[in-house]
């Protein structure tokens, strides 16, 4: 399927996970404006990389394990206005992190990680790979962030609320700290089902927690959601 945003176009036909609201929210929320070197882990179609290119002047490196998704990501990058600042590498993030030139290299890392921790996988192997933590668990993801992030850098993630206890357990035993947390509600009168996270290597005293509601009880986007995504969605 193809998606047209205000400044770029995404073709995600060969990607395990299509363009999602989760990805758009993460790409719009992450503090990227000052970043010079950005790493997109598990890039898929390249949505987050392209959003990062629109929102910053930095260079973006995307890493994608699945071959067809990496090809789609490259295609979308080449078609964009920022092709000279975008690149994709087809490899496992753990192999990527073994390359010493990337140690402590990126001042922002962004990732919409796999989110099914267990249970039956999708019939389509590409979709299964994108959706299940079997291919990238939380501990290896945090290790990759620690290796590649600069001392003063940040990492932005979005996770299902139900995954937070296990994620925070892994975080506690890592060298990363939770700086900001946004509880995301799909509808105004529902409990939060997603969480936006900002991580850093430095423990900060101004930890922040807030909420984002995507739609009101009338089914329309909230003012907050419109303000967050208006630079991307065509109809806002």
From Swiss-Prot:
Known catalysed reaction(s)? adenosine(37) in tRNA1(Val) + S-adenosyl-L-methionine = N(6)-methyladenosine(37) in tRNA1(Val) + S-adenosyl-L-homocysteine + H(+)
Q: Where in the cell is it found?
A: Cytoplasm
Q: Which UniProt keywords apply?
A: Cytoplasm, Methyltransferase, S-adenosyl-L-methionine, Transferase, tRNA processing
**Cystine pairings recorded for this chain:** none
One GO term of the biological process aspect: methylation
Summary of the function given for this chain in its UniProt record? Specifically methylates the adenine in position 37 of tRNA(1)(Val) (anticodon cmo5UAC).
| Protein name in the entry | tRNA1(Val) (adenine(37)-N6)-methyltransferase
């Amino acid at each position: 399927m193809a998606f047209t945003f205000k400044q770029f176009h995404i073709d995600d036909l060969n990607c395990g996970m299509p363009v999602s609201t989760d990805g758009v929210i993460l790409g719009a929320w992450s503090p990227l404006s000052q970043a010079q070197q950005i790493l997109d882990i598990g890039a898929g179609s390249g949505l987050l990389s392209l959003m990062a290119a629109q929102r910053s002047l930095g260079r973006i490196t995307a890493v994608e394990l699945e071959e067809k998704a990496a090809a789609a990501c490259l295609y979308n990058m080449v078609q964009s206005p920022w092709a000279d600042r975008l690149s994709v590498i087809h490899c496992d993030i753990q192999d990527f992190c073994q390359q010493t030139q990337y140690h402590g290299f990126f001042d922002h890392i962004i990732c919409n990680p796999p989110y099914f921790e267990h249970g039956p996988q999708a019939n389509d192997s590409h979709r299964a790979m994108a959706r299940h933590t079997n291919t990238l668990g939380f501990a290896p993801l945090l290790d990759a962030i620690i290796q590649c992030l600069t001392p003063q850098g940040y990492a932005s993630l979005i996770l299902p609320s139900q995954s937070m206890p296990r994620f925070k357990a892994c975080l506690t035993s890592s060298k990363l700290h939770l700086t900001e947390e946004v509880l995301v509600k799909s509808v105004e009168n529902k409990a939060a089902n997603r969480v936006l996270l900002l991580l850093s290597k430095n423990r900060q005293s101004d930890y922040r927690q807030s909420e984002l509601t995507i739609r009101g009880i009338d089914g329309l986007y909230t003012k907050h959601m419109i303000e967050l995504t208006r630079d991307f969605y065509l109809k806002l």
